[in-house]
Amino acid sequence: MSRGNELVFKAKKTSEKISENIHIFANDPSLAFFRVQEHVRKVTPAIFEKRDEVFQLQNNLQGHCYDMEYGIQALRTIEKSESIFENIQEMIKASIFLKQQLKYEESRKKVKKDSTKSSVYKRFSAHLALDLPDLPDFGGVMRETSQRMENMIGPGTATGRTEAQAATSSNPGELQRSYTTLH
């Protein structure tokens, strides 16, 4: 019986090994699936974070593309408005030129006004600087005329002669010159 026991023992051991191998083969796919499930569970949050980051980058890229398109449109409208800017530049040049002309005319009028005030007598006296013949003394005639005028105007004004009248009555030639330069 020893031989029978030994055979039973070996058969039992072999059947256990076969059973264990069958069990391993039967559970091996489930173990593989368990390992895959573990891996997916660990990697999924990182994948979702990357997915969100990609969506955010896509939105940013789309916004930058819109900005670039708006910039291109703005540049095209600026290129189209070149003629308008040239017209504005020409108008500015014309207005600067007109302003300079007005300034020149104003300064010319001012100089002319100043020169007419001061140089009329100078210009006329320059002509008189030539050798003029001696004029007769009109002092007496002028005194008589001034007295007649004072008498006609009134007796109160005869004594109130101005300094200019007194100065001109002493030198009748000067009076004559000044009257001619003012008219």
Swiss-Prot record:
InterPro entries: BORCS8 (IPR019320). Residues 159-183 have a biased composition (Polar residues). GO terms for cellular component: BORC complex; lysosomal membrane. Keywords: Lysosome, Membrane. It is found in: Lysosome membrane. Its main location: membrane. Residues 152-183 are annotated as: Disordered. May participate in the coupling of lysosomes to microtubule plus-end-directed kinesin motor. PANTHER family: BLOC-1-RELATED COMPLEX SUBUNIT 8, MEF2B PROTEIN. Belongs to the BORCS8 family. This is BLOC-1-related complex subunit 8 homolog.
